[in-house]
């Protein structure tokens, strides 16, 4: 990042943004986490649900058991939990359309009134040479058969390849078909080689669209979630940034913003406990007030413990990929007694080695010890 320019040269009004404006030209790129600290808000936790497999078939009992465990953990701490279905944790890129639809139907049958978020992406565009919004239509139509859900428009190669103005137009074209609230999705190339995060102008344009209620951003190398949060809070935008940073869980909790992460699938009780511990006693809904009358400072050690565990779940392979986190998640959930099988989707090549169960047991030593010390249930 270049040196901080003089504050009077920084853009602070959205009307001054241009499609080519970079974040470092704005005031929001220079807002610190400390400036955004929030001990009052109780944002939701959006937890991506693993679709476990037994052999080559989905383990439906395991799938539902994971969601029951998540909801029970969140209810204990008074946290709003929104399951995220058919995202990367749910093998969206390997799911056939019928299996995609079955995931949603089985969820809705078991949980008839629970809100959920569902990922949609482009289908059938492998031979395309340009962006086609209609590629999103098959999964979008399947998702919108259900009520009380939000649609996460996951980025795709040709949508991401567009310049900011045409990329905005692409999202707006997809939004014409939205009948449910929409969530936009951005990645850094550190996750997917062709991905680029949103420029400030593009974020402002999308955040101003009435059908988009929020967005998820996942980055490893630059703090775009802080940029988003600073801009949206400063401008009072009716748009909720969601952190997709599995390596930075504490940041979202500390600044009072929602999480939308695959990591939550294996550590929901820890995240919910941390969210409650971070709240000041003055928050009426705080489940476990402290004797000191303020937030529980032991949360800092809980942050460390849960992040050290998720750093193991999301560890890089020698190709620089974390995609096998899904397999690690299955082993972690089996170690917790939530599921009984750790197979992956038969067409997914992202797998850990045969010692993964032991690796996860080792990674869970500290968080389990912290859970016992703090009286956090459902993580024995």
List PLM regions with ranges.
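C-terminal alpha-helical cap/extension of soluble enzyme domains
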Residues: 6-36, 44-52, 73-77, 257, ...
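Active-site beta->alpha loop and helix N-cap motifs at the rims of alpha/beta catalytic domains
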Residues: 10-197, 349-352
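A short, hydrophobic/aromatic-rich structural module that often spans a beta strand
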Residues: 20-26, 37, 170-177, 228-241, ...
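General structural feature for long, well-ordered alpha-helical segments within catalytic domains
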Residues: 59-66, 99, 103, 132-135, ...
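Alpha-helical scaffold segments in soluble metabolic enzymes
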Residues: 106, 173, 205, 227, ...
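Catalytic alpha/beta core domains of metabolic enzymes, predominantly
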Residues: 177-322
């Amino acid at each position: 990042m270049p040196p901080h320019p003089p504050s009077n040269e920084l853009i602070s009004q959205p009307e001054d943004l241009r499609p080519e404006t970079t974040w470092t030209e704005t005031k929001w790129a220079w807002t610190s986490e400390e400036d955004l600290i929030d001990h009052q808000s109780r944002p939701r936790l959006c937890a991506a649900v693993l679709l476990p497999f037994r052999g080559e078939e989905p383990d439906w009992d395991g799938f539902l058991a994971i969601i029951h465990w998540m909801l029970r953990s969140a209810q204990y701490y008074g946290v709003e939990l929104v399951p995220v279905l058919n995202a990367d944790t749910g093998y969206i890129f390997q799911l056939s359309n019928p299996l995609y639809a079955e995931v949603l139907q089985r969820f809705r049958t078991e949980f008839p009134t629970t809100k959920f978020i569902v990922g949609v992406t482009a289908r059938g565009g492998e031979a395309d040479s340009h962006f086609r919004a209609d590629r999103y239509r098959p999964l979008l139509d399947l998702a919108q058969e259900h009520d009380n859900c939000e649609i996460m428009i996951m980025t795709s190669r040709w949508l991401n390849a567009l310049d900011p103005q045409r990329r905005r137009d692409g999202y707006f074209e997809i939004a014409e078909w939205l009948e449910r609230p929409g969530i936009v999705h951005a990645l850094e190339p550190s996750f997917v080689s062709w991905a680029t995060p949103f420029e400030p102008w593009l974020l402002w344009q999308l955040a101003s669209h009435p059908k988009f209620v929020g967005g998820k951003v996942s980055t490893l190398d630059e703090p775009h979630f802080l940029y988003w949060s600073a801009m949206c809070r400063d401008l009072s935008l009716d748009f909720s940034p969601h952190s997709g940073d599995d390596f930075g869980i504490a940041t979202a909790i500390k600044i009072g913003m929602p999480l939308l992460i695959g990591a939550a699938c294996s550590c929901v009780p820890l995240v919910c406990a941390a969210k409650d511990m971070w709240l000041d006693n003055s928050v009426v809904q705080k489940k476990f007030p402290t004797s000191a009358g303020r937030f529980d400072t032991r949360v800092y050690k809980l942050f460390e413990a849960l992040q050290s565990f998720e750093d193991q779940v999301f560890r890089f392979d020698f190709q620089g990929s974390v995609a096998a986190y899904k397999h690690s998640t299955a082993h972690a959930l089996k170690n917790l007694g939530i599921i009984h099988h750790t197979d992956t989707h038969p067409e997914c090549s992202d797998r850990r080695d045969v010692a993964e169960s032991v690796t996860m047991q080792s990674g869970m030593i500290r968080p389990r010890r912290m859970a016992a010390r703090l009286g956090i249930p459902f993580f024995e």
